[in-house]
Amino acid sequence: MAQTVLGQKRFRKYYGKIREVLEMPNLIEVQKSSYDLFLKSGDQPQPMDGEGIMGVFQSVFPIKDFNETAVLEFVKYELEKPKYDVEECQQRDMTYSAPLKVTLRLIVFDVDEDTGAKSVKDIKEQDVFMGDMPLMTPNGTFIVNGTERVIVSQMHRSPGVFFDHDKGKTHSSGKLLFACRIIPYRGSWLDFEFDAKDLVFARIDRRRKLPVTTLLYSLGMDQQDIMDAYYDTVTYTHRKGEGWVTKFFPERIRGTRPTQDVVDAATGEVIAEAGKKVTPRAVKQLIDEGNVSEILVPFDGIIGKFAAKDIINEENGAIYVEAGDELTWEVDKDGAVTGGTLKELLDAGIEEIPVLDIDNITVGAYMRNTLAADKNMNRDTALMDIYRVMRPGEPPTVEAASALFDTLFFDSERYDLSAVGRVKMNMRLALDAEDTVRTLRKEDIVSCIKALVDLRDGRGDIDDIDHLGNRRVRSVGELMENQYRVGLLRMERAIKERMSSVEIDTVMPQDLINAKPAAAAVREFFGSSQLSQFMDQTNPLSEVTHKRRLSALGPGGLTRERAGFEVRDVHPTHYGRMCPIETPEGPNIGLINSLATFARVNKYGFIETPYRRVEDGKVTDEVNYMSATEEMRHTVAQANANLDESGSFVNEMVNTRQSGEYTLAPRESVDLIDVSPKQLVSVAASLIPFLENDDANRALMGSNMQRQAVPLLQADAPFVGTGIEGVVARDSGAAIMARRGGFIDQVDATRIVIRATEDLEPGDPGVDIYRLRKFQRSNQNTCINQRPLVKVGDKVGKDDVIADGPSTDLGELALGKNVVVAFMPWNGYNYEDSILISERVARDDVFTSIHIEEFEVAARDTKLGPEEITRDIPNVGEEALRNLDEAGIVYIGADVGPGDILVGKITPKGESPMTPEEKLLRAIFGEKASDVRDTSMRLPPGDFGTVVEVRVFNRHGVEKDERALQIEREEVESLARDRDDEMAILERNIYARLKDMILGKTAVKGPKGVKPGSEITEDLLGTLSRGQWWQLALEDEAEAQMVEALNQQYEAQKRALTARFEDKVEKVRRGDDLPPGVMKMVKVFIAVKRKLQPGDKMAGRHGNKGVISKVVPMEDMPFLADGTPVDFVLNPLGVPSRMNVGQILETHMGWAARGMGLKIDEALGEYRRSGDMTPVREAMRLAYGDEAYEEAISGLDQDDLLERAGNVTRGVPIATPVFDGAKEADVNDALTRAGFDTSGQSDLYDGRTGEKFARQVTVGVKYLLKLHHLVDDKIHARSTGPYSLVTQQPLGGKAQFGGQRFGEMEVWALEAYGAAYTLQEMLTVKSDDVAGRTKVYESIVKGEDNFEAGVPESFNVLVKEVRGLGLNMELLDAEGEE
């Protein structure tokens, strides 16, 4: 078995059998690569590739004025350095962005009035600032106004052409009406559809339908062109007395029953008898013999056919029959011929008649009938018709109609199929246009209609719109590109108007451009688009999943009300591309999906998944990425197919997928095989061990609930994992990886300094400083805290984990805790999924988490004067001010509770007119307190915690208070420390290199005391200060130059370091950009410690969730034979009906892992007593198995082995990958090696009585998570508070400090009990009887206990509503009084 070695700190025993040939790609690559493509550097002009910001500029520029006397061209663009880095933007509530500078060229022409010839008069070039462009952080997010946001990728229908039918729903007969739709990337939609009478219609932008021939006329075709495009011509030759002779096509009669005998024209022989079915064999025989070329058709066989072209009298030009006219033969009731077009032709002596090849079996007369029904006969009237539909109410002219029609589909500014659309159209219609042809062509429209008619005739298949070849992904870059294009087009209109209105010779490009529309479009997209979402930052997994999300909602997508079942369902093409498990449970089910683990998005926006190539039944290591359309052509085997040593299939028949169907196929026909069993599922689902044993519904809940797990105080990686925990921790950015190899120079809680020894470039000081995030608040108020894992002097390699983040443990994702559980009922406390916990869990902070709340207060400049942040608050006692410093701001470390003042603030009050007495008192005592009111920020009810950080922001030019200056000093000191450390390492490196250069060389001259020509030795250098070493001039010219170069490099790096430091200090000291009217802002961060308590929600990884019902003293919990009390008691009835048996296997495996860990712990104890390593090595061999032990552990030296063994004493971690994990035999083997019974059950004793329970109980170790549904956040109480304005009833919800709704059903309950007075009280004085409420308050104050109920306000609202309807309604008492 392969062995995964994660971070070299802890080994996982790996149970996977299938060899992995492909590394899992970076999990946030989707976001990063897309935005990188959008912002790719624009220094050098690039060809018009239509990609990224370059493509946007090239599609909008050049801009000409209305007279075409000037043109504004785009030259290049450049992104400057961002003003603030990511951390500064988060602290200051700024957007992390870089200024975009665009170089534009304005060319002014001289126009010769006589000839109209243009000559260049003037060319001006200038750099123009075009607003700020948000940048992506290294973790694939954006900082917008100080908060981290994610742009979710959108799934939408790919541009191209689609064929479909209405499934028989439109017409009562259930007839299938076929339709075709051309969807461009941007521009008007074009639909073609059949109606119930089999006529073909076109619609533009879903407006009123027109006959499709109107559209074809508009394209410049005439009646004859349309006939030729859609029908073949067959000539019928008249044979007197016998009928008509025509060409014979044997294929046409296959499977039909001819109504008349089919007769060979040459021999008169009957080929097929009337009424008999023609078999395929008979047809094949006719084709093979090939001696029947023409057949004889009875005279009336031509009646009802349609003429293929105009038949004209040669002499006088009179038209007998027009193309498309029906050939008729009119007979009266006596049988005498009275007329008809056929008679006219025969009378005129026309013996050969070309007719349209329509047999109404394989070819229908749809297009001919549509032509006949169309009132238009030429291009002009057809264009006018289209104009009337598109612009109803406007008087049409031919020029306007023609211009409108051209801009609809043939103007690249208005219509864009995109490369994807063109490729899809070429594939569907077998065309070969270049993918740079982005508008429609006449051939495209004609081919679409042809394919639609073929469908109606029974040839071809409709498209499946849910196939992933017909749905594509728009990632960040593309969404941003579209948005920016909208902004630039708005700007273009303004530029054109300005070019016409100003004196063009004197202006510069800067004067023509107002970049606001473009900047506003960007701001609007990041701030308010449906796809720009507040990042889910509960834990590292939720971050990664959010970035990999695919949404079908959003602008240009579906709406959840209109999305049907098919769109939401799992499709065969989702395999390896989109996860069939992870999706929300509510109304968005199936509309929001997750990218599968190995999937990636190709340049056309289609999702691809990797496969290994199979050649002649042998699996190779060559990996190919396939989109859904490409995969349809292949036969794909599953990753778990049995292979022999050489990689060939063992079985003759292999389980495969062919064009969406699961079949058994011979091994020779297989040409691809999955790269890994987990390529089917998403990241969250692949973190569930034994996923294959869980029901899909529960697996869905498990995937979703892992994202809600709160990071705990002490992270603990799962004993039973799947092997990808390390990948998630790495790619999420939670754990810190070394950028390059080197030695640890310094470590403390806030930073790690590495002296790099690898990947050094000339001029690089080789110092990497990693700043750790300490107790920062995430978007979800969880705590982001990083802890170093390394010691000074440690050697680290590139990408080694050097620090753990939230929910990571030694570089592995750790969302919950390994705890000992027992499946048994316990006095009804685990009824309905309740969970019973031991007091030990609460006492030892096993599931304690830290949450950080942010409170913000701003002092504004009001009309009555500025607000002030101060400690001097009117009518507040010293006790309430105990936590405030002299500036009125709470100090760090203060423990605060509900109602405590965090920041003291006073606001000027409106002056009320003073009485003379007040004026006198004011004059004598200078009483000032009356004109300000206390608006201090207090802690809301229900919150307790410790102040961990305070930030003070001052406006430019506002004097800083003592607290602000203190914070500033601390920040500057921290920056200075960083600078000094970097300088020290730089000096150490440079002087070490200098020493190597000059040691043993001859000095020509040097500082005082060094004789010319003396050799440079250690002793000599020891007598000089380091600064004097540079003064030693070497004899060798080349070496002297190298020393000089080193000196210059050293000085340059010192200057750069100082400049960087000064820039940062200047930013700290500079005032802050605050919103208008705000003079000063204070943010207070409070850390809240949340222990596990009844009402908190917990869950496992298998969708098994529950709420804690009771905390039981440790001594009362059931305990094992060795006296160990269990931590959790779960209900066994929660397993069978839910069918998530994976949790039981996990429990057994975890029990075995714990048993192994205890054995290793015993062996370490033995080693400490005797100093003998043998027991430790044996215990490790037993735990990991011989093969893995030999491969990874046997070669370790004693210290390394002891460290590894010490890390697994609580339990030996194992990895059981999804669909390729431990089987039942492996579980039994693990239990046996750990010394347990293979049933996984143990004897348990009742903690209260000490008696053994009657039967054995399943006990094991399970990984449980604490979810972000904490009872502290939900519990809430109110006495008096805010009321709704209209109804005067208390508001609802904790956020509004609302009350508990006493609803309709609750009223029924009280009525049923006959509790009349209680009911009256509930509906009046405790709710919306305003006068009654006041009276109750008064009687409470007076100490009385009587009150009177009045009329509820909601009744008054009802009366007013009824009066609003014009009905007078009054409330009268028994005496008839109002």
Swiss-Prot record:
Its EC number is 2.7.7.6. InterPro entries: DNA-dir_RNA_pol_bsu_ext_1_sf, DNA-dir_RNA_pol_bsu_external_1, DNA-dir_RNA_pol_su2, DNA-dir_RNAP_su2_dom, DNA-dir_RNAP_su2_hyb_sf, RNA_pol_bsu_bac, RNA_pol_bsu_CS, RNA_pol_bsu_protrusion. SUPFAM superfamilies: beta and beta-prime subunits of DNA dependent RNA-polymerase (SSF64484). It catalyses: RNA(n) + a ribonucleoside 5'-triphosphate = RNA(n+1) + diphosphate. GO terms for biological process: DNA-templated transcription. The keyword Cell division does not apply. One of its GO terms (cellular component) is DNA-directed RNA polymerase complex. Coiled coil: none annotated. Keywords: DNA-directed RNA polymerase, Nucleotidyltransferase, Transcription, Transferase. Gene3D superfamilies: 2.40.50.100, 2.40.50.150, 3.90.1100.10, DNA-directed RNA polymerase, beta subunit, external 1 domain, DNA-directed RNA polymerase, subunit 2, domain 6, RNA polymerase alpha subunit dimerisation domain, RNA polymerase Rpb2, domain 2. CDD domains: RNA_pol_B_RPB2. GO terms for molecular function: DNA binding; DNA-directed RNA polymerase activity; ribonucleoside binding. PROSITE patterns: RNA_POL_BETA. Belongs to the RNA polymerase beta chain family. DNA-dependent RNA polymerase catalyzes the transcription of DNA into RNA using the four ribonucleoside triphosphates as substrates. HAMAP family: RNApol_bact_RpoB. The RNAP catalytic core consists of 2 alpha, 1 beta, 1 beta' and 1 omega subunit. When a sigma factor is associated with the core the holoenzyme is formed, which can initiate transcription. This is DNA-directed RNA polymerase subunit beta.
